[in-house]
Every structure is written in structure tokens, then in C-alpha cells.
A protein has these predicted regions:
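Residues that mark the junctions of alpha-helical repeat units in TPR/alpha-solenoid scaffolds
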Residues: 15, 75, 152-154, 193, ...
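Residue at a conserved register position within TPR or TPR-like alpha-solenoid repeats
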Residues: 163-165, 230
Length: 282
């Protein structure tokens, strides 16, 4: 029988909530698995984009209009890549016959999907056009229905790249190719980590400046992953670099501590220094 619009939307939200939860836990889809995207229900309705403060940033007319994907759809699509990356990371100890720089490798396939997702993101949801930093604290809290998913999408996008290129996980993957690793590949992964890890600390700084309280524990999980990168990078002889990396680590750790009411995060930060848990986090 035909469902009324309210019931149909509730069922969509229920389905995608369960699927999103399983993806974020890195779990196999199981009973929720379906064959092909055509069999999936349409994405749930997203909140309208907040009023823009000014017109410094031009949004192209060809950005989708009424058919533009909402912020919830963007977040859900990025969660699919997160699932693939976490499963890839869990197989870090298993040797592969293909090096990650091979176009046919799992690494290259996931990286291509991540880049493809960026081409589908409407410009209005991207960092600069969204104008988060220009919104008042009151407006940010009033429009959490939009900014919550937007922040989630920002965090998972950058953390996807950080986890895929994590220096510790990558070193385990490269053990079988020590004599033939292209220098350009190592430089590329280093640049990606540097850029996208800094975006996480930049976002954390924005929350602090706007006094915007975030409550999603997944964001703490993302910050913890980035913290492990900064911690590993701090073990250098150069004092200036060491202090910079430890400062970034401390910023991530402070953010993670804002989620201690969640047991798994509480255990993570229970050590006064935090270093031991973070070094074992992955």
C-alpha cells in the first residue's frame, strides 16, 4: 500500500541511520546489504542551507539547484568510503602482491573513490561557501540541523585521507616493497597527511573560537586518529618541529577529552599523558 510522506521519510531515516551506524563501526553490512545502489531508498531529507552572510563567494548557477544533494546525502556517501578505509586498515598486517601506488591496488581504488566523492559535493556545502566562521554562535546553535551533518562531513572527509595515508599503517603495508618504493609516492602521502591533518586542527580551533559545543563522539574518534599522526611525527630531533607536533597533539587530545562521557573515549584519555593509549590506538 502507498505510504504517506511522513511515514516514508521516517522509514528512510531509520534505514540510513542503521546503515550509517554499521559503516562508522567498520562493520560488514550483513542483513542490510542490498545489490546495487538502485535498490537503496532515496536519501533522507536534509535541512536547508543557512542564510549566507555575504556574497564574497560566488556559487555557480550550475550547482544543482533544486536537484542538488543535501548535506545528509553527502555525509552518508562519505561514510561508505570510511567503511572501506577502516576495513583496509584492519588488514594492514596481511601482505599484498600489489603495492599501494599500483593503479589496480586497493589503496588506489579507495583514493579514486574519495576524489570522485569530492566532484559530487555541491559547492554550497564546501568549506568556504558554507561560511561557518562568519555565522554567529547563536545562529550556529539554532541551525544544528544543518551544521551537525556539515561538521560530520568535514571531519570524515579529512579523516578518510589521514587514515588511508597514516604513516604507521602505511609502513606496515610497505614492508614487502622496501627496495622499490617510489620517492614521489612517499612525498605524496606525506603532503596529504600534512594538509588534511591540519584541517582537523583548524576545525577544532573554529569550534573553540565560536564556542560551539560539538557532541558527536565520532568527531572525537576522528581527532584521536589525527592525534596518533601528530604523536608519531613528534619523535624527531628538530626541537621546533617536535614542539609544533606536540602542540597539535595536545589540541587534538583536548578536543577528544570533551567526549569522556563516552566509555571508549574515556578509556582512551585515562592516562594522564595520553601517549601510551594513543600509540596503541590503531
Amino acid at each position: 500500500h502507498t505510504l504517506d510522506p511522513v511515514t516514508r521519510e521516517e522509514r528512510r531515516r531509520c534505514f540510513w541511520s542503521l546503515l550509517l551506524l554499521k559503516r562508522l563501526h567498520g562493520a560488514e553490512i550483513g542483513i542490510l546489504d542490498v545489490t546495487g545502489e538502485d535498490n537503496l531508498p532515496w536519501y533522507p531529507k536534509s535541512a536547508e542551507t543557512p542564510t549566507r552572510i555575504d556574497d564574497d563567494v560566488t556559487i555557480e548557477l550550475g550547482d544543482g539547484g533544486k536537484n542538488r544533494q543535501g548535506i545528509l546525502a553527502i555525509a552518508i556517501q562519505l561514510s561508505e568510503i570510511w567503511l572501506k578505509i577502516t576495513q583496509y586498515a584492519r588488514r594492514r598486517g596481511k601482505p599484498s602482491s600489489l603495492p599501494p601506488w599500483s593503479p589496480q591496488s586497493e589503496y588506489a581504488t579507495i583514493m579514486a573513490q574519495q576524489m570522485e566523492s569530492e566532484t559530487r559535493m555541491p559547492k554550497i556545502h564546501r568549506f568556504k561557501p558554507a561560511q561557518f566562521s562568519k555565522q554567529s554562535t547563536k545562529d550556529l546553535h539554532t541551525r544544528r540541523d544543518y551544521w551537525g551533518p556539515w561538521i560530520f562531513a568535514q571531519f570524515i572527509y579529512h579523516t578518510n585521507i589521514c587514515l588511508l595515508n597514516h604513516p604507521l599503517l602505511l609502513s606496515l603495508r610497505l614492508r614487502n616493497f622496501q627496495s622499490q618504493i617510489p620517492e614521489i609516492f612517499l612525498q605524496s602521502t606525506s603532503d596529504l597527511i600534512s594538509s588534511h591533518a591540519s584541517w582537523i586542527t583548524h576545525l577544532i580551533g573554529m569550534f573553540e573560537a565560536k564556542m560551539y559545543k560539538v557532541t558527536d563522539p565520532f568527531l572525537g574518534h576522528c581527532a584521536a586518529i589525527v592525534a596518533t599522526i601528530y604523536l608519531q611525527e613528534s619523535f624527531v630531533d628538530d626541537l621546533a618541529i617536535r614542539e609544533e607536533k606536540m602542540g597539535n597533539f595536545a589540541q587534538c587530545l583536548g578536543f577528544v577529552r570533551g567526549f569522556v562521557e563516552w566509555p571508549h573515549i574515556g578509556r582512551l584519555v585515562s592516562d594522564p599523558g595520553g601517549e601510551r593509549q594513543y600509540s596503541d590506538y590503531l
